[in-house]
Amino acid sequence: MKKLLSALALAAVVAPVWAATQTVTLSVPGMTCSACPITVKKAISKVDGVSKVDVTFETREAVVTFDDAKTSVQKLTKATEDAGYPSSVKN
C-alpha cells in the first residue's frame, strides 16, 4: 500500500513535466489583405492552450506556441478554417 501511494504521488508530480510547449508554423495562403492576419490571430488565440501567436501577411504564415497537453495542431488548423482561412503545417 505504501508503494502504491508513493507511486501515485510521484505520478502527480511528474505528470506536468510530460506536457511540452511546442511551436508550429502554419501556412495560411488565403490571407489576401492586411486585415486578414488580425482575424487569424484572434481565431488562434481563442484556442485553449495557445500562449503566443504571430501572424505575418507578407509570408502568409502564423507561428503558434502552444501547450500540447491542452491543444493540438489539428485544433489550431480547425480554428483558422472555422474563421475562413484554411491552414496547414508548413514543412
Curated annotation (Swiss-Prot):
One cellular component term from this protein's GO annotations in UniProt: periplasmic space
Chief place where the protein resides: periplasm
Organism: Pseudomonas fluorescens
Transport is among the record's keywords: no
Any Pfam family matching the protein: HMA
InterPro entries assigned to the protein according to its UniProt record, in alphabetical order: Heavy-metal-associated_CS, HMA_dom, HMA_dom_sf, MerP, MerP/CopZ
GO molecular function ontology, one term from the record: mercury ion binding
Similarity comment text for this entry: Belongs to the MerP family.
Highest rank taxon of the organism: Bacteria
Keyword Signal part of the UniProt annotation: yes
Name the UniProt record assigns to this protein: Mercuric transport protein periplasmic component
